[in-house]
Amino acid sequence: MAARMCCQLDPSQDVLCLRPVGAESRGRPFSGPLGPLSPPSPSLVPADHGAHLSLRGLPVCAFSSAGPCALRFTSARCMATTVNAPRSLPTVLHKRTLGLPAMSTTGIETYFKDCVFKDWEESGEETRLKVFVLGGCRHKLVCSPAPCNFFTSA
């Protein structure tokens, strides 16, 4: 199962906000060094969860040294999935899942940032609102508030 998310950029703070679609919860803005950051729950976040990275809204496994789970990050508009992503990405994610050396966390972070921001910059959309799907992962958001279940079990 996968969760549907609203992904909205707040240009005044350069904060990426993720909220569940159609849920009563409004979620919280997630930000890096440019804005406030909610304290993560210790039970959900391993020691190497990648808190130093600027991108928020991916599950904790995305930047773990053990590698991410099988990720499928999909833009409902441009279908930027691991299927039609740069050829090496599915292999990279698979290798990291197995704990093998692969792309650096910076490379993976850059790929997901491109998925989110490229269309906004090129199309100049004023609403800057997208719907993304992330499936096949048992982890929660790095900064997810405890009552909000953004992602479901695989």
Swiss-Prot record:
Region (Mitochondrial targeting sequence): 68-117
Domain of life: Viruses
InterPro entries: Transactivation_prot_X
GO cellular component: host cell mitochondrion; host cell nucleus
Keywords: Activation of host NF-kappa-B by virus, Activator, Apoptosis, Host cytoplasm, Host G2/M cell cycle arrest by virus, Host mitochondrion, Host nucleus, Host-virus interaction, Modulation of host cell cycle by virus, Transcription, Transcription regulation
GO biological process: DNA-templated transcription; symbiont-mediated activation of host NF-kappaB cascade; symbiont-mediated arrest of host cell cycle during G2/M transition; viral genome replication
Record's comment on post-translational modification: A fraction may be phosphorylated in insect cells and HepG2 cells, a human hepatoblastoma cell line. Phosphorylated in vitro by host protein kinase C or mitogen-activated protein kinase. N-acetylated in insect cells.
Function: Multifunctional protein that plays a role in silencing host antiviral defenses and promoting viral transcription. Does not seem to be essential for HBV infection. May be directly involved in development of cirrhosis and liver cancer (hepatocellular carcinoma). Most of cytosolic activities involve modulation of cytosolic calcium. The effect on apoptosis is controversial depending on the cell types in which the studies have been conducted. May induce apoptosis by localizing in mitochondria and causing loss of mitochondrial membrane potential.
Protein family membership: Belongs to the orthohepadnavirus protein X family.
Quaternary structure (record): May form homodimer. May interact with host CEBPA, CFLAR, CREB1, DDB1, E4F1, HBXIP, HSPD1/HSP60, NFKBIA, POLR2E and SMAD4. Interacts with host SMC5-SMC6 complex and induces its degradation. Interacts with host TRPC4AP; leading to prevent ubiquitination of TRPC4AP. Interacts with host PLSCR1; this interaction promotes ubiquitination and degradation of HBx and impairs HBx-mediated cell proliferation.
Listed name of the protein: Protein X
Organism from which the protein derives: Gibbon hepatitis B virus subtype ayw3q (isolate Hope) (HBVgbn)
Native organism taxonomy: Viruses, Riboviria, Pararnavirae, Artverviricota, Revtraviricetes
